[in-house]
From Swiss-Prot:
Subcellular location field: Golgi apparatus membrane
E.C. numbers: 2.4.1.-
Highest taxon of source: Eukaryota
GO terms, biological process: protein glycosylation
Topology, Cytoplasmic side: 1-34
Tissue: Expressed in roots and hypocotyls.
Residues bearing carbohydrate: 70, 169, 230, 390, 426
Record's GO cellular component terms: Golgi membrane
The keyword Lyase appears for this protein: no
UniProt-recorded name of the protein: Probable xyloglucan galactosyltransferase GT17
Family: Belongs to the glycosyltransferase 47 family.
Protein source organism: Arabidopsis thaliana
Keyword terms: Glycoprotein, Glycosyltransferase, Golgi apparatus, Membrane, Signal-anchor, Transferase, Transmembrane, Transmembrane helix
Record topological domains on the Lumenal side: 56-455
Length: 455
């Protein structure tokens, strides 16, 4: 196989007579000045509101679809303090960044193109908002709780957790989660199975909700509460050893199609794009972490290889925050290296698969123990695993994989794209199961198999 660095580009007022002009000139100037002042004030107010409260929570109903799944889901209408009320403080929902642009458009973020678009600059920790918007418009939603198979509790727990991450008063850090659990466990429908048919969807990792009594790393105790342990908790990263009620859902990427045709067009494009690079790495080094060593090694090997494209992310580098730049690197590559980041999992994995790039993992907890609802049982069919302890020469190992194997693996990766993608909440003519459909189907099956109802 030959590889090179060739780039692939994926009305005016009518005038009055002189007498009228003279008579009203002074008044007219006063009116003009007043109007201009009002216009300026309105513009300033509009700009302020746009920058500070740009979110839209408009669960606009799409064209009605038939429920093609064998389940119904009930959505609790929670007090606003548990979800959309949090967005009023969007500038302070994250200690590192202003989240106002990111909570716009029901969590999809800012559009990457003008007009109606399916591409957005979506924040990696915003899945809970997108999930909420999708379920609100889901064809299998029921407004009759007595007919529901599963019950969705739309708590924006991730956004709340990140807003109080540095709160030293642990009681205050936990208080909203505690109020939520007290509220939901007091509902009639909780009592029919003690919450075992209820679920949360959280956009952050499970570690942010598992503070024990003797440790404090910024987390709250939501997932440690006994009543929550009865529920199913969907999260972008589960605790892989003891999180029996944790279920991994994909990190949101940038593509949220309105129609099935858009998805199929994208898949065809990824099947046919030229991939001049054997492999690539998008990421930066880590300090003070066990995972730092493998990251440093990946950066080193990629930088030294003529077959690897490196997009190094340091000090919040803007290129790494440009979705099209990131996807461009991945679409030019056959394999994409996926080292653990601050935790085991990475949004980059889902960006890579969206770009049709075969992921290479160095820890089983980056993918294999996380997203079982979404992936084939045969891990080797869509990915490569290299144990980080084996000091593997990455380029040599990847070159051992035959061209036919690469083609087959890439086809499976591209076939997986729809189920790893969050369709647009207002999608129309979209009949491919997306990330939300997959999760709801699995939750309903689990409830039917395991829940004993008593009222």
């Amino acid at each position: 196989m030959t590889f090179n660095k060739r780039q692939v580009k994926i009305n005016h007022w009518p005038e009055k007579n002189d007498k009228e002009k003279q008579k009203y000139s002074k008044n007219r100037e006063t009116v003009k000045l007043t109007l201009l002042t009002l216009l300026l004030l309105c513009s300033i107010c509009f700009l302020f509101l746009t920058l500070n409260f740009p979110f839209t929570i408009e669960f606009t109903a799409s064209i009605p679809r038939t429920c093609d799944h064998n389940f119904t889901v009930y959505v609790y209408d929670l007090p606003k303090e548990f979800n959309i009320g949090l967005l009023q403080n969007c500038r302070h929902l994250n200690i590192y960044t202003n989240m106002c642009p990111h909570v716009a458009n029901n969590g999809l973020g800012q559009p990457l193109h003008r007009g109606r678009t399916s591409w957005f600059s979506t924040h990696q920790f915003i899945a809970e908002m997108i999930f909420h918007a999708r379920v609100e418009n889901h064809p299998c939603r029921t407004y009759e709780p007595d007919t529901a198979d599963i019950f969705y509790v739309p708590f924006y727990g991730g956004l709340y957790a990140s807003s109080v991450f540095r709160e030293q008063n642990l009681t205050k850090r936990d208080e909203l989660a505690v109020r939520l659990v007290n509220y939901i466990s007091g509902q009639r429908w909780w009592k029919r199975s003690n919450g075992r048919d209820h679920f949360l969807a959280i956009g952050r990792t499970a570690w942010d909700f598992m503070r024990s009594s003797d440790t404090d790393f910024g987390a709250n105790m939501l997932m440690q509460m006994p009543r929550v342990m009865n529920m199913s908790v969907l999260t972008v990263e589960r605790q892989p050893w003891n999180g029996d009620n944790h279920f991994g859902i994909p990190y949101p990427s940038y593509f949220h199609p309105y129609t099935s045709a858009e998805m199929v067009t994208w898949q065809d494009k990824m099947k046919n794009v030229e991939r001049p690079n054997l492999f690539s790495f998008v990421g930066g080094p880590r300090k003070g972490l066990e995972k730092a060593a493998i990251r440093d090694e990946l950066i080193k090997q990629c930088a030294e290889s003529s077959h690897c494209e490196l997009l190094k992310c340091e000090n919040g580098g803007s290129r790494c925050h440009n979705p099209m730049t990131v996807l461009g690197v991945m679409a030019r590559s056959r394999f994409c290296l996926q080292a653990p980041g601050d935790s085991f999992t990475r949004r980059s994995t889902f960006d890579a698969m969206l770009a049709g790039c075969i992921p290479v993992f160095f820890s089983p907890h980056t993918m294999y123990t996380q997203y079982m609802w979404y992936l084939p049982d045969d891990k080797r069919s869509y990915s490569v695993f290299m144990d980080e302890k084996n000091n593997t020469h990455i380029e040599q190992e990847l070159l051992r994989i035959s061209e036919n194997e690469v083609v087959q693996m890439r086809e499976i990766v591209i076939d997986l794209i729809p189920r790893l993608t969050y369709a647009h909440p207002n999608s129309t003519n979209y009949d491919l199961p997306d990330a939300v459909d997959i999760a709801l189907e699995a939750l309903a099956k689990q409830a039917r198999d395991n829940v004993v109802v008593s009222l």
